[in-house]
């Protein structure tokens, strides 16, 4: 099975160098690496060409450790425009997005994930739609946090109301882009959320979690402005995708569900349950009087 790893880059030469090296180190041979550069003015293009020259390949395509790498460098209209270019160039059955600065955590991780994929698909009539693992996040203060995302729980509307599946450790069937369309280029930050919502929640496509640490994701570029824009776009998309009758009920029930999760996280649910039972008995006693 061919996995297409798509890397988006713009003026991040050092990050690109590290990303290329992490992909080149993979022991799994059947990797197609598509690099979409947005017309960088730093050393990015020269770094790609160095790899090409080192492997005796012509510009635009190179072979590294049995991996096919195809690339282009031209201006784009934003990250989702660039990602869609990468999807159009892809020929693998599954796509993984690993942007410049992001790393695969060890040389065997792709092999591990493909083995899990083969085991899952061997038990199914149709190939899995999305398979995802864990990622580690490098925070702006240098701390590294472990993120299992949904951690194997059901992928539901409620989950997408408060978050999204992580992108870099996900293997997405290329057939889903053919079925649901590619990323919405009118959005600046939330198009992957929209695609997941349409395919996994509304389209009920299959999804599987594998407890493997797959990628190291650089969070240093995530600003408060980006977070605010994400919330704005997400709310707009909820209005666009979810019928109003369902959405109104969901808004009404989301707050108590969120509070319930917080209480469980801090091990206070037992106390709340005790108080609830006391109030129930008092209410029952009052009715019987």
Short names for language-model regions:
Residues 21, 88, 235, 239, ...:
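A short, amphipathic alpha-helical segment
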Residues 243-244, 249-289:
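Membrane-proximal basic amphipathic "stem/tether" segments
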Residues 110, 200-204, 222-223, 238-241, ...:
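Short amphipathic alpha-helical patches
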Residues 212-213, 217-220, 224-250:
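Catalytic core of nucleotide-sugar-dependent glycosyltransferases
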Residues 1-227:
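Nucleotide-sugar donor-binding/catalytic module of glycosyltransferases
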